[in-house]
Amino acid sequence: MRLVDGAAAIQGDLPAAATRVVDVPVGAGESQGTGVLRLTALQSVLTNQQRVLASTTGPVITIGGDCAVELGAIPHALASSAESTIAVVWFDAHGDLNSPETSPSHAFHGMVLRTLLGDGPEALVPGSPLSPAQVVLAGTRSLDDDEAAFIDASGIRTVTSTELQQPGSVAEAIAQTGASRVYIHVDLDVLDPAEIDGVGYPEPFGLSVQQLVQAISQIRASYPLVGAGITEFAPSTPEAASDDLPSILRIISALTRPVQRPEEATP
């Protein structure tokens, strides 16, 4: 329930009129022989999320929950901007590039990006998968061997935590995709454990909040945002949630505040 509590804690600081809630079943769900834990529960959440998204207009900021919320959010953003070429920047300590066959845990949050790329359980693969050429992994520093091999074989672009300290590094990687618009995924474990406590799978040598906010700001200075996701907030107690919320709200602000790009400036 920590992920549910994390999402609820963030919701408490968001404007109610601009927030919609997706119902999440409390049952454990079944794998149905797919090698994916809780598959049927994931299907139910995806259906509910798609129903809510169908009634929205404009870019949506999706608050998880785990990274599986991107199964509904990213295809929705791409379909809403079908005339544009979209890059997905995946800020995450982990690649989320396992498959049911390679996953050590069979937990779906480690397979989300692979599924969005069209290689995952059939019931969850989107109708129009991403291409590896659209994806930029940012701040990723913990990969299983099969994930690393998939990155090498597919040519997915990567920007390390060290490289993110260089201004413009992630924008340059996006430019190489040829995209005109961007979707930003943020798994909060991309941050260094010294920066945030409420994540389930912390990894050392991550970003500071300031570095992440700056990277998001640099992206938005060059590319319109078609949507974003913030995931994996799992505080252990309400008090711990309160300690982390100021950092999370800074990230939300970086994703939502108005931005005037150079081409939009008034002469």
How would you label these PLM feature ranges?
Residues M1-I61, A73, A79-E83, D152-P267:
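Catalytic cores of soluble, metal-dependent hydrolases
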Residues G6, H109-V112, E147, S169:
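Internal, well-ordered alpha-helical segments in soluble enzyme and binding-protein domains
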Residues V69, A93-L97, S142, L188-V190, ...:
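Short, glycine/acidic-enriched loop or turn micro-motifs at the edges of active sites
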Residues T62-G65, V89-D92, A138-G139, H185-V186, ...:
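Short beta-strand segments
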Residues P59-P126, Q134, Y223:
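Active-site histidine-anchored catalytic micro-motif
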Residues L143-A149:
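Short, glycine/polar-rich helix-capping loops at beta-to-alpha or helix-loop-helix junctions
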Residues T102-V112, F150-T158, E203:
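Short, surface-exposed, charged loop/turn segments at secondary-structure junctions
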Residues W90-A93, L117, L137-S142, T160-T162, ...:
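Short, structured patches in soluble enzyme cores that scaffold and shape functional sites
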